[in-house]
Each structure stands twice: as C-alpha cells, then as structure tokens.
C-alpha cells in the first residue's frame, strides 16, 4: 500500500495538470488581458502599463467610496436595513409604504386620461382628420383631468423616507400641459380605446398633471387604436371623422367635478398607520371611479369609437365620390366597380339594393351602384391596366386575394392571368363591370339590373339573380345579344316565358324595362354555354335602361371565326326547325279545314283559337329563327333577314306577334303589348335609331346599325312602326301577318318562309308516328268548347269535330288553345295574333270569319295599316291586361300525346301540351325541373305572353332555347 500511494498521487497530479493545460488560455488572450507582455514589446513597458492601470482602478474605487451615500440614505432607499428601529415597526412601515404605492397606482389608473385626451396630446396615433377635429375642439368630450387634481394630503401620505422615490414616479411637466384645461369635446360615447399606461401623478399638492407630454408624434394615419380591456392595441383601421359634437362642459360643471373628486380622495390619504375611521365616515371605494373619472373615460371611449366609425364612413363616401367622378371619363376604380359578366359567379355579387339604383338612364347609370356593392366581390378588370397606378393595381389584387408584391408589370400580368382563369367562355362578350357598359362603335349596349326585369319578365326561368346586371347589346346586324353578369348557364329549356312588362299591366314596373326585349332567357343551352342571351326587343322602358353609346371594346374579344361558324350552325338549325314548324302548321291547317267541313262555323272557331295560341308560340320561336341567334351572340346573316314581306322560303319566318298594340310610335293605349315579334323584326331589320315606346309612355332609343339591306322593306310598308316593321317577317300574301295589324289578335302571321313547301297532310301524319287521336284529347276539346260556350265566346251549337289527332307532333294546335278570346285569357292567349302559315292564304279569312261570328266584332283586315286599334283588339287587350292569367300561369308539363285544357280559376284557360312521348328526344336532360319537363313552365314570376307548347321536342332538342 505504501508503495502504491506515491504512484496514485503522481497520477492524480498528472491528470490535473493535463486538464489545466488543456484549458489554459492562449498567449493572445493573456496578452489582451494584460497578464503577459506582447512578444514584440519590451517587458519593462508592459510592467509600466500594468502599474498605470492599477492606479486608475484604485482612484476610481476611492472616488466611489468617498461619494457613496450615508447609511441613513441607504436605509431610506431600502438598500440597507434599519437596525435601530424595532423590527415590528419596520415591517409595518414597509406594509404601509407598499399599500400607499398601490393606492397611488390605482388612483392614477382610475384617473388615467381617456383616448380623446391621449389623441390631443399626440400620445395616441390617429388619422390626421380625426386628430384635428379633437384638438381644434370640434368634438367635445368630458376630460378626466378635470377631476384628477390631488389634495394637499397627497404628499402627506408618503413616509419621510420616500420623497425622492415617489417623486421619481411623478408626472413630468410637459410643454403642452396648458392644453389640459382647454375645453375638450364632450360626447356621450367614446371608442373602446382605453389607455393603460398612465404617467404617475405628481405628489405636489394641487398639481393636476396627468400625462408626461411627449413631443407630438406624427400620427400614424392607419393606426387608430382598437382597445380591448383597457389596453391600447394599435390596429390598421382608419379613424373615422367626427360628426357628433356635444356642447363643451361649462366651467361650473368642471369645477363641480373637480370638487367631487377632491371630496372622494381623502379615504386613503387620511389613513395614517392604524388610524380608525368609523364606518359612517368611510366612503364607498367603487363610487368615485364610476361617478367621476371612470365614467368619463367610458364616455371618451364611446365617443372615440363613434368618431372612428364616422370617419371611416366618410372616407368611404369620399372615395366613392372620387371614384364616381373618375369613372365617367376613365376606367372605373375597383371600389366603384359592379361585378361584370367576366367574373364567374362572383359577378352575381351585385346587391339588390344597389341594382335598382342603376336603373337611372344615362351613361353613368351603372356607375350609380350604391356603396353596398362596394368591395363585395371583384368585378371585371378595366381594359387599360397599363394606365392604372400601382396603388390601383394593388387594390385590384387585394380584391382578388392575390399577392400585391412586385413591379407594375408583374402586378398587371398577375391580374390578367387571374382574369383569364375566371373569364367566361371565349365566345361570350365580356360585359365590363364598370359603370358604363361600352360597346363597339356600331353597337348599342343597354344595361339594366336583372332585379328590374324579374318582376314580370322571363328572366326568372333563366336563373338570373335579381342582383345581376343584364346587358343587351344591339349589334350592327340588328341582333340583340343579351348577356347577364351571372355566368351560370340557365338549364331550363322552358319555352319563352314572355314578360308582361311591356303590356302596361299594373304589375309591370318601370324597372321591367327590357322585359319584352328579354323574352327568351335561355341562352347557354342553345349553342354554347356563354352568359350572353339574345333578347327580343319589344318596347323597352328607357327609364330602366342605361344606354351607354360610348364604345367600350370589352366585346371585341369574340372570336370572329367561331362566331361565323356558330352562326352558320344556328342558321341551319333554325331552318330545320322552321321547316318542322311549317309542317306542323300545315297539319294544323288541314285539321282545321276538316273540322270546318264537319262543323262549319264551329270548327272554324276552334281552329282559330288553336291557331292563335299556336301562332303565339311560333312567334316566340320564329323571332329567334329570324336573326336572333340565341346562343353566344350568334348573328343570323342578313340572308335570313331578307324581306319578310315576301314569303321567300329562305328567310326563317319572323313571327310578327303584335299583341293588340300597333308598333307605331303613336301607340294607342290599347296597343300596350309590344310583342316579341316586333322586337324580332326590329332586330332583323335594324333600322336607324329606333324609338321604342312602351304603354307607359317611356321611350327607349336604340340605335342599331342594320347590315341587312333587305331589312328596310317593311312587310306592311309602313316605316312608321319602328320596331315591328323593320323586321316584321309578315309575308305580303298573308296580309294578316303584317305587323301593322296588331289588332288581329287571332293570327300573327308567322310567315314561316321555308325553303321547301310544307308537306301534305298525309305525309305529315306519316312522319309523325304518334299523331293518332287520343280519346282524352277529344275530351279536352269538349271541355274547352264548353268553357268557351259558357263564356259566350262561341255559339252554343258549336261542337268540336270528332277527329282531332291528339298526338300530332304539332302541339301548336293545343298550345293555341289558350284562346285569346276567353274572358280570362291565359298567358297563351296573351299573344292574340297567331301566325298562320303563309301557305294557307284561305285560313286568315276563316279565322276572321270565326272571330267576327263568335265575337260579333269586325276584325282589322290585313290591308288595314292604320294605327287605330279595332274594338276586338281593345277587348282582347283589356281582357289580357285585366286577366290574372297573365301573371299567374303555373308551369304544366307538356304532353304531345294529349291536349291538356286545364282551366284554372286564377290563370284563366291555359292550354298545356304535356309531352308524354318525346320521340328520340330526352327532354329530361334539359329540363330544369319538374316531373315531365315543363316545356312552357309559365312561372308566376315570369308569365309568358305566348305558349311554346306547340313545339315538339323531336327535332328541337337543345335548339328549343334558340327558338325562344
């Protein structure tokens, strides 16, 4: 053991040395610390330097020792404990000091200045306008400083050892101190901006300083304080301007407040150590805060919040005003944009409250969207992004939740890329969301809110939200392209639900402006899913339409080639459809002749009603064929616009539906119905600026450039009829079709000018397999005739011919049965003028005979061009206007196999063809709803003036919409 001990010791020493060597400082460190001399400097110099440093340190320490405070001071500063006093006394003194400090802090917090005072002293950053209003004294608020003066006892509460410490916390006198006494706005409310950080109160007696006034800070304009729980949290909201102003508190009130505060203070100040105060002399601690300073702070907070809100509202209004001023000449600012059709669904964000306001005529009509629509959803991008400022571009990006960083070019590219993603189908013209919808030079764009149309128009079936903007563009071809800002394609193949807007009915409001123009809401099912819808222009009310003739090139993006191809396809489809219609018309005519032979006077009357109803259906369909390309703004070439006067087979029949109102500018009161046919003819033969007069007397001037030279020829040759004549396809031979003869309610000459003669009766029957008569159809006819006899429209001896093919593919016959002559004309009968096929010249005479015999009233002959309506027309018109059927015609499924005569008390007699067997046609795919697919769901919201029930879906399929 003794031998091992030295060895173990050596090993331990070695390990320690080794560890120290590893941890020793480098020479550089030793030199820097002055422990070792530098290698390059002599050792003597190093020693001298070290001695100097030691002497300096010694002198410093000596000075500190000499200047250190006395023990009493250290005891007072609580650095040293007081040994002379009793320990119990020391403990009590400490407790008392702490309690006093807490009381002082509580008082300062309770009497802290309110947000208004902080704003006035530049402590609280707010917007300059708000700050100016507060400082200048526009807003009066109760000042907490009024009641914040201290009693003379405030310093007495401090122990003798504490003066310096408390004084250090005292408020620092500020140069703006005098401002505290300025009359500060008094108001009943202030924002929740409570300021926690209070500057300590001055202990000196009578001193009223609250805030250590800091040099004025430039107010951060976008950082109004939003306060929670008495703490200031600056947020990015702009502070509102001040609108409420209260009377400044009178000096007497202020003095009363200060006295009250002084009375409440002594509760803590008078307490010295364990002094006893009887309960009756004790004062409620909570009362003073609520009564004086705390209540004032709450008032200031409420007032401040109100001011912020008002300021924000004012700023928004000013910004909107500025944008509105800039909109007229320049692209709209994003804030004033109303969502356009180019934005997919967000474009439906127009608030209904703002839509009606846009109905005011004028180029800025759309610009007057109320601010409620502001910033709701991004609208269409302005065309001139390059001209916009970076701030505007960033605002556009923010509206679309896109990043706003980058150069101007990057911002523009980002916006355009986003717009490309959300823009509608290429063929759809983009209706600018800007205030004025501008079109190309040759076009007139009529924009109006869908909400104005929804009351009586067919827009309801189109799925248009009332808030959407509807833009109708009358192109140079005379075609009206109708686009809604909503991009969702209407799914319903519902036939035209004619809007009663132009009928002058009490239910039609001036907002219904384009009601008649927009008879067929179905747009996207026809040729392409574009939000554009083609409109039949029937007298629109100028009041609700904003004609912005200014050209805006938003519509220039259409692919010309694609448009031409689609136009060709549409023409072919329309031609084929018209041929089928002609066949149906011929079949109907043959049936009517047979019926007339069997029941000479009676059959004539029965056919007339069918014909009228049917013609009304045709009217709705044919106008489309005639130059109204419904899908994606297809414009039918002028070849189809050929003179409608001549029954040239080329031009699709333009249905001249004149519903009791001559289209002439001087519309008689009875001629209140501007029929879709008029709009159709107008579109086809676009005449120079056309004045459309509605029954209400409102005038809409549509300047449409006409590319079809043949268009000028009016069927009746009376140029005075601006709408109906220009394009009235009424062939000369069937004079009854002349647009000028609106009084002929029973027939509107469809003048379906087909390229081939209508097939014979046998051929038509063979082509239509399911045209065999149904027993139920004859039963329905009997019911119809019974109703007619009861109403006195036909003679009692009138009976329906026993044989009436019920399944005939020409539902037109059934559709025509909404007899215009019935006292309660159904929406089907609302189109009094049926369009008999041009091929049957004798039919008009029979119809006239029937009408004259059944009503005893003379009919207006086809040659009659005078504007004065006939008594029969007046009667029909008055019936139509007075009939609730115009408004309330429930949708009914169409069955080609049966003729449903569903006399409904509210809607009068409405003929609904239920299409039971849709040969090779699956309407269910197209039906927007309903068990069978109501081809003509005449919704109560959008009653139709004529029924499309006569159309068979066999060949129409998707093109059903186009025939509207």
Swiss-Prot record:
InterPro entries per record? Myocardin-like, RPEL_repeat, SAP_dom, SAP_dom_sf
Q: Please classify the protein's predominant subcellular localization into one broad category.
A: cytoplasm
According to the record, the residues making up region (Disordered) are: 145-292, 328-371, 484-508, 638-673, 706-779, 796-849
- Start-end of Polar residues biased regions: 186-197, 497-508, 764-779
Q: Sorted alphabetically, which keywords does the UniProt record give?
A: Actin-binding, Coiled coil, Cytoplasm, Nucleus, Phosphoprotein, Repeat, Transcription, Transcription regulation
Instruction: Fill in the PTM field for this protein.
Output: Phosphorylation at Ser-41 by Erk inhibits binding of globular actin (G-actin), unmasking the nuclear localization signal (NLS) and promoting nuclear import.
Q: Which Pfam families match?
A: RPEL (PF02755), SAP (PF02037)
Consequence when changing residue 52 to A/D: Induces a nuclear accumulation in unstimulated cells
Q: Where are the RPEL repeats?
A: 15-40, 59-84, 103-128
Q: Does the keyword ATP-binding apply?
A: no
Entry domain remark: The N-terminal region is required for nuclear localization and the C-terminal region mediates transcriptional activity.
Annotated protein name in UniProt: Myocardin-related transcription factor A
Q: Which organism was this protein described from? A: Mus musculus (Mouse)
